[in-house]
């Protein structure tokens, strides 16, 4: 039997890690030889989740072609967000809830993408369709992913399907959603001990009309906890622009209590962000009122503006 590795995107978040583990558990129950791995360090929110449910973190890998010939992707599809040697392996399956971009294969594959708030919402359907029982632990992980990606159902990406899935998973995991959810989000929003690199850890790269754009996001309970370190943050953003040849680096600092954000933009195309949101950046900073979702309120808007 051919072994498969399953993983989410670089700079993994809670959905990426929990989806990889959950997908692996589903496939193992069906007799597959599969292992969940990760492409980066855990953030503090995900570390809290794994500790809470007493789950070992997936193994960290830099490359995959040296181990396997087949992989499955969760929570992403875009090539630049995936493992560096993705072109050297065969992608046999994708389960995702993002746009499809910069992705093609030479062979047919299982591809499932749905416009929901979280990958594990789709995975719960797959467990049920295949009549595989969701364990208490895996239910806790899947619930945590939904809470994370939907900001406890406050994000505009959240659908009724996500809410229904969360209720079902909470019953299996024996977790009270609101109290656990706030505890989990606050664990991720504590930036007091984070390095500057860790503040920018949740970053994704996109190709927008032949422009290289990186968008990082962090959730906080007070944006000033990050803005007080703006000089250090901007220095690292600038270095990333040089190292990666980026046209734009946008850092979205989201207050999970007010559901507003502040943006820091650096690069040759910052005017695109100003046009997209009708704001003016002063010392690289501007308010982004009501913006909480990179997937729904940042990526598509910037993509459309770059295309003008």
Swiss-Prot record:
<keyword id="KW-0963">Cytoplasm</keyword>
<feature type="binding site">
    <location>
        <position position="9"/>
    </location>
    <ligand>
        <name>Mn(2+) 1</name>
    </ligand>
</feature>
<feature type="binding site">
    <location>
        <position position="97"/>
    </location>
    <ligand>
        <name>Mn(2+) 2</name>
    </ligand>
</feature>
<dbReference type="GO" id="GO:0004427">
    <property type="term" value="F:inorganic diphosphate phosphatase activity"/>
</dbReference>
<dbReference type="InterPro" id="IPR001667">
    <property type="entry name" value="DDH_dom"/>
</dbReference>
<feature type="binding site">
    <location>
        <position position="149"/>
    </location>
    <ligand>
        <name>Mn(2+) 2</name>
    </ligand>
</feature>
<dbReference type="InterPro" id="IPR022934">
    <property type="entry name" value="Mn-dep_inorganic_PyrPase"/>
</dbReference>
<dbReference type="InterPro" id="IPR038763">
    <property type="entry name" value="DHH_sf"/>
</dbReference>
<dbReference type="InterPro" id="IPR038222">
    <property type="entry name" value="DHHA2_dom_sf"/>
</dbReference>
<dbReference type="GO" id="GO:0030145">
    <property type="term" value="F:manganese ion binding"/>
</dbReference>
<comment type="similarity">
    <text>Belongs to the PPase class C family.</text>
</comment>
<dbReference type="GO" id="GO:0005737">
    <property type="term" value="C:cytoplasm"/>
</dbReference>
<keyword id="KW-0479">Metal-binding</keyword>
<dbReference type="Pfam" id="PF01368">
    <property type="entry name" value="DHH"/>
</dbReference>
<keyword id="KW-0378">Hydrolase</keyword>
<feature type="binding site">
    <location>
        <position position="75"/>
    </location>
    <ligand>
        <name>Mn(2+) 2</name>
    </ligand>
</feature>
<protein>
    <recommendedName>
        <fullName>Probable manganese-dependent inorganic pyrophosphatase</fullName>
        <ecNumber>3.6.1.1</ecNumber>
    </recommendedName>
</protein>
<feature type="binding site">
    <location>
        <position position="75"/>
    </location>
    <ligand>
        <name>Mn(2+) 1</name>
    </ligand>
</feature>
<dbReference type="Pfam" id="PF02833">
    <property type="entry name" value="DHHA2"/>
</dbReference>
<keyword id="KW-0464">Manganese</keyword>
<feature type="binding site">
    <location>
        <position position="13"/>
    </location>
    <ligand>
        <name>Mn(2+) 1</name>
    </ligand>
</feature>
<dbReference type="InterPro" id="IPR004097">
    <property type="entry name" value="DHHA2"/>
</dbReference>
<feature type="binding site">
    <location>
        <position position="15"/>
    </location>
    <ligand>
        <name>Mn(2+) 2</name>
    </ligand>
</feature>
């Amino acid at each position: 039997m051919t072994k498969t590795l399953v993983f989410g995107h670089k700079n993994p978040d809670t959905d990426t890690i929990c989806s990889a583990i959950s997908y692996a558990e589903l496939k193992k129950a069906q007799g597959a030889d599969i292992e969940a791995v990760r492409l980066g360090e855990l953030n503090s929110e995900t570390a809290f989740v794994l500790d809470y449910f007493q789950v070992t973190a997936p193994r960290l890998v830099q490359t995959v072609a040296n181990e396997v010939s087949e992989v499955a992707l969760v929570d992403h599809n875009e090539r630049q967000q995936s493992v560096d040697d993705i072109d050297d392996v065969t992608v046999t399956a994708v389960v995702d809830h993002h746009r499809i971009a910069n992705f093609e294969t030479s062979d047919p594959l299982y591809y499932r993408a749905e416009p929901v708030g979280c990958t594990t919402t789709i995975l719960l359907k797959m467990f049920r369709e295949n009549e595989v029982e969701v364990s208490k632990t895996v239910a806790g992980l899947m619930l945590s992913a939904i809470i994370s990606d939907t900001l406890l159902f406050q994000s505009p990406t959240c659908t009724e399907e996500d809410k229904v899935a969360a209720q079902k998973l909470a019953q299996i995991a024996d977790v009270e959603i609101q109290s656990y959810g706030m505890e989990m989000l606050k664990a991720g929003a504590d930036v007091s001990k984070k390095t500057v690199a860790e503040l920018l850890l949740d970053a994704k790269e996109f190709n927008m009309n032949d422009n290289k754009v990186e968008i990082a996001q962090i959730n906080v309970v007070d944006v000033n906890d990050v803005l007080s370190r703006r000089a250090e943050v901007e220095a690292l953003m600038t270095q990333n622009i040089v190292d990666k040849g980026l046209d734009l680096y946008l850092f979205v600092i989201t207050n999970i209590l007010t559901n507003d954000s502040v943006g820091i933009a650096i690069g040759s195309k910052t005017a695109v962000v100003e046009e997209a949101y009708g704001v003016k950046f002063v010392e690289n900073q501007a308010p982004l009122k009501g913006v909480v979702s990179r997937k729904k309120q940042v990526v598509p808007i910037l993509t459309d503006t770059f295309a003008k």
